[in-house]
């Protein structure tokens, strides 16, 4: 009986170690891929062959790696292009808002989210992000109004419904 328990323990422990090693290898590969992609895009930018999409991809990678200030620089470079359409501008401003909120620069995040909504008034994600910032700043009335606006554009939005009921219950 002791041999069985010992064998079971060894097998179980080995499986846990293998799972951890597998997870670590995947994370290293993912990080390595992102680093190689950053190098490729930087080289392309340095050679002045980069497009707005390349800057956007680079900024998105920086966000994944939580390098927010570098991502912000790349998005601001994209904004220098005067040929962007409204949807591109809205996406960039929404991303800038996300970057600022991740750095707890809530006032600047609010400005960027409002700019995104200026270009696309029914941009649901920007409205939800803006409502979330209002919640973080304890501006309950503004958050409620923003979630209600989300429901005007998307009446079936479950996140907005849930958040709205939570905030309303907190106020009561």
Curated annotation (Swiss-Prot):
Any Pfam family matching the protein: TPR_12
UniProt xrefs under SUPFAM superfamilies: TPR-like
Major localisation: plastid
InterPro entries in the cross-refs: TPR-like_helical_dom_sf, TPR_rpt
Location relative to the cell: Plastid, Cyanelle
GO cellular component: cyanelle
Residue stretches in coiled coil: none
Extent of the TPR repeats: 52-85, 90-123, 124-157
Keywords attached to this entry: Cyanelle, Plastid, Repeat, TPR repeat
Family according to the record: Belongs to the ycf37 family.
Protein name, UniProt field: Uncharacterized protein ycf37
Organism: Cyanophora paradoxa
């Amino acid at each position: 009986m002791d041999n069985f328990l010992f064998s079971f323990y060894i097998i179980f422990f080995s499986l846990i170690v293998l799972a951890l090693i597998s997870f670590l290898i995947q994370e290293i590969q993912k990080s390595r891929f992102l680093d190689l992609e950053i190098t490729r895009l930087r080289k392309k930018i340095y050679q002045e062959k980069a497009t707005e999409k390349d800057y956007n991809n680079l900024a998105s990678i920086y966000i994944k790696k939580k390098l927010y200030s570098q991502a912000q620089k790349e998005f601001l470079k994209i904004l220098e292009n005067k040929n962007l359409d409204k949807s591109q501008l809205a996406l960039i401003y929404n991303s800038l808002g996300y970057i600022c909120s991740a750095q707890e620069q809530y006032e600047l995040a609010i400005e960027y989210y409002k700019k995104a909504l200026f270009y696309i008034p029914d941009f649901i994600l920007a409205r939800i992000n803006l409502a979330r910032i209002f919640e973080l700043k304890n501006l309950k009335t503004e958050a409620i109004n923003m979630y209600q606006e989300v429901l005007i554009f998307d009446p079936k939005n479950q996140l907005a419904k849930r958040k709205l009921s939570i905030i309303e219950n907190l106020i009561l």
